[in-house]
């Protein structure tokens, strides 16, 4: 057991174990995404991340622009399976010449432990078309994060001395430290 003046439970994506009843009121879901590490058949000397129009309609900063509507319409017309599986191509180089390729988005209450091979095949096909060369996949994995709550994050006071902090988007690593600072200040005041 744990004892403390204040305890903050930081969830990650597990909304069904600790404080499940309090979490159920938020009606949260999770997102499971598939990722690949691949080697290109030729030296691409790629120095920066590569995004496509698929990414532009996935991220709100771009998707909310009026110009994105035409891109979204083309995707829905020509490749509805990409929209259905939340596939948007991101390619990031590693220092060793490999490429990190992703990703897909599968939303629900539970994350299947099994990847969909067809989703990987579509991402490989998109990457090869975009890069203009074949790639060899050397690793596959999935990520899971909390998603689609009542806002981008929640901070609940579950009981006296017990709080819960949850992210509902895939930006936890980016904004997590600021969220922690804000939540601690809410409990004890600014530093």
What does each model-identified segment do?
Residues 45-54, 79, 86-99:
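Conserved FAD-binding catalytic core of PHBH/FMO-like flavoproteins
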Residues 2-63, 133:
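Central helical "cap/lid" subdomain
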Residues 85-88, 92-100, 106-191:
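C-terminal catalytic lobe of FAD-dependent flavoproteins
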Residues 28-30, 81-85, 147:
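A short catalytic or substrate-binding loop motif that flags glycine-/basic-rich loops and adjacent residues
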Residues 61-87, 91-93:
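Oxyanion-binding "anion nests"
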Residues 16-20, 69-75, 134-137:
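Short Pro/Gly-enriched beta-strand edge/turn motifs at strand-loop
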């Amino acid at each position: 057991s744990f004892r403390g003046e204040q305890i903050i439970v930081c969830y990650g994506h597990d909304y069904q174990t600790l404080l499940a009843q309090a979490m159920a009121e938020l009606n949260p879901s999770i997102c499971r995404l598939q990722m690949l590490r691949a080697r290109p058949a030729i030296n691409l000397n790629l120095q920066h991340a590569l995004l496509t129009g698929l990414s532009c309609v996935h991220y709100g900063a771009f998707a909310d622009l009026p110009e994105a509507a035409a891109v979204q319409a083309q995707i829905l017309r020509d490749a509805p399976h990409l929209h259905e599986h939340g596939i948007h191509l991101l390619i990031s180089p590693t220092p060793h010449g490999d490429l990190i390729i992703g990703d897909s988005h599968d939303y629900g209450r539970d994350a299947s432990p099994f990847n969909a091979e067809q989703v990987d095949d579509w991402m490989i096909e998109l990457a090869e078309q975009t890069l203009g060369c074949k790639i060899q996949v050397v690793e596959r994995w999935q990520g899971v994060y909390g998603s689609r709550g009542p806002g981008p994050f929640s901070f609940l006071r579950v009981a006296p001395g017990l709080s819960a902090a949850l992210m509902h988007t895939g930006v936890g690593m980016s904004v997590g430290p600021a969220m922690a600072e804000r939540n601690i200040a809410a409990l004890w005041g600014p530093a």
